[in-house]
Amino acid sequence: MKSKRDNAGHAAAAASFFAILVAVGALSVFLTKPTFSALENRDLEPAPKFSIRALFFEHFPDHVSSWYSDTFPGREQLVGAATWIRGLRGVGGDSIHLGVGSLQDFEDEPETLPAGAPQAETTAPPVTAPTVPDVEGEMKGGVLVVGDTALELYGFSRKTITRYAGIVNRFAKTYGLDTSVLVTPTNVAFKLPARYQSMSGDQKEALELIKSELDSNINNVWVYDTMAQHSGEYVYFRSDHHWTGRGAYYAYVEFCKSKGLTAAPLESYETYDHTPFLGSLYRAVGGDAKIKANPDTLTVYRVKVPYTIFQYSKDGGGNGLQTELSLKPEALANSEEKYVAYASGDPPYAKIVTENNTGRKILVIRESFGAAFTPFLTEHFDEIHVIDFRYFNGDIGKIIREAGVTEALFVNYITAAGASVQMDRMERMLGWSN
């Protein structure tokens, strides 16, 4: 008798579980699909269009899988909860998560990608950032909140940093382009109170490792010192993991110095202020009263050179969507996603055509940190081809050949350069892995 009751209970439980799976599956198909992730600050995978060609030649099943997982009901809440849980138990540094950093310096084996010859060292006076008060903060889901500022702790993986430099070296050899690299530190390098220094990796050491691993023909744009020098200014957001437009400008100045170009004066730009801005780290901690009480202002420096910009899909095909590089406040008045005011967000591929006549065309390989930086390049190039390596899956060699690209620039932030999942994406984008 007991066995029959047990069997009936098991059957009822199985039926209930199956019904829940069917209901959730049905909801995930028929509910309205989101198109943007506020937590991750990115566009979500669009619904793929079926065709025989797509099925056999364009990885249609993979696109369906990505679309389904990206638009699953409650995904945003689940991602936020996962971030919080990871923060409670600590996360290793060979991965990247919004607001979750490593608490140790990983000593990994070297990568198999070829390492370049160390570059010659230059002697320069040491630059130090202003002294940071050694005040107490609060850990929230892997993010350290100090007063009204959220700090994303940094995980230093030597293995992945070396891998990043190897990818750049291989790219330059493959395409024969004059190649530059600009990797920026984050605010935790300059704003972390002394009592928490052991909880975050040394970003300057990581940047020096990149420099030492790059081939001698690679132009390494060293921006650590200028970011340290200006760290007392508003060069990083308090509620977001990105630099501000001003921070990106100072990096642009260093790029110009390294290339023999004259940077446009900061005061020559018209500005648009988007406020209030509460960014990725504010969302990662689930909201914080002190941060909310003193929100960021996102300042856009308006492009001065006449231009057109077209955004393209992941494979780089189609006619492109014409948009703007400098969005006005009224365009985003009712939007929380004000970071897209820089270069209209993170399209997989964008082509900017200016009215310059320099004969120079540049390919920029970046993630979201490059959005605030790229518009400054319009002063110096006829065309700027911008690839977000996280999303683009087209033929980058075809773009280089058909556009007549003359040089390339990698613009990345140190957390992305040291994250294996991001390096996987970069290699896939370059067609070096599946």
Regions found by a protein language model. Give the residues of each.
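Extracellular glycan-modifying ectodomains
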Residues: 1-434
